[in-house]
Every structure is written in C-alpha cells, then in structure tokens.
Swiss-Prot record:
Record site: Important residue of the cationic membrane-docking site (MDoS): K96, R99
Family: Belongs to the phospholipase A2 family. Group II subfamily. K49 sub-subfamily.
PANTHER family recorded: PHOSPHOLIPASE A2 FAMILY MEMBER, PHOSPHOLIPASE A2, MEMBRANE ASSOCIATED
Organism: Bothrops neuwiedi urutu (Neuwied's lancehead)
Subunit comment: Probable homodimer; non-covalently-linked. A model of myotoxic mechanism has been proposed: an apo Lys49-PLA2 is activated by the entrance of a hydrophobic molecule (e.g. fatty acid) at the hydrophobic channel of the protein leading to a reorientation of a monomer. This reorientation causes a transition between 'inactive' to 'active' states, causing alignment of C-terminal and membrane-docking sites (MDoS) side-by-side and putting the membrane-disruption sites (MDiS) in the same plane, exposed to solvent and in a symmetric position for both monomers.
Listed name of the protein: Basic phospholipase A2 homolog BnuTX-I
Length: 108
C-alpha cells in the first residue's frame, strides 16, 4: 500500500516521500504519466502495478525484507521495495525543479 511504500522510500532515501516524490516529474504520484524527466522519474515510471493490497515487511540490517506467505502480496511488496531501492540508487539525479512538476505538460 502507499503507507508501506512511503516508509520504504523514507528508509532507503532519507527523504520525505510525499514532499520529495508525491508530485515529482511526470510519473511519481497518483496522476503519473508520460515520458520520464530523469532516472528518478523513471523509477516511478516502472512502478505502476503496486497499489492494491496491504502487506507487511520488516527493516533488518538496513535492508527491506518482504515476509508474506501470500505470493501475490509478496510480489506487491517486492515491487515497492524495488522502486524504493531505485530511488535511492538514483538520488544523484534528483532535481528539485521536478519536485512539483505539472503533469499536463508531460508527453505520452
């Protein structure tokens, strides 16, 4: 869910997820669409399948561990984990000018 995703992003990047990524670029946030503005925005672009059910995870030794017996929920958790790690790995591309990018200007 968005709650777990937000926690993962905070843990991986140290950034406030809503403030830093809630409207970042063309693809981060609820109305995300269009060509990614940079590598950070591309992380959100590939993360379009993860919003459905709530799942649980733990934070052990600075690593996200998805611990579900339900394979569907584990897959959702792994998807959120992947975007959180992608955002951390691309912190160097984070550009404040895209923080509140207007989605209508994004091209499909």
């Amino acid at each position: 869910s968005l709650f777990e995703l937000g926690k993962m992003i905070l843990q991986e990047t140290g950034k406030n997820p809503a403030k830093s990524y809630g409207a970042y670029g063309c693809n981060c946030g609820v109305l995300g669409r269009g060509k990614p503005k940079d590598a950070t925005d591309r992380c959100c672009y590939v993360h379009k399948c993860c919003y459905k059910d709530r799942y649980s995870y733990s934070w052990k030794d600075k690593t996200i561990v998805c611990g579900e017996n339900n394979p569907c929920l584990k897959e959702l958790c792994e998807c959120d984990k992947a975007v959180a790690i992608c955002l951390r790995e691309n912190l160097g591309t984070y550009n404040k000018k895209y923080r509140y990018h207007l989605k209508p200007f994004c091209k499909k």
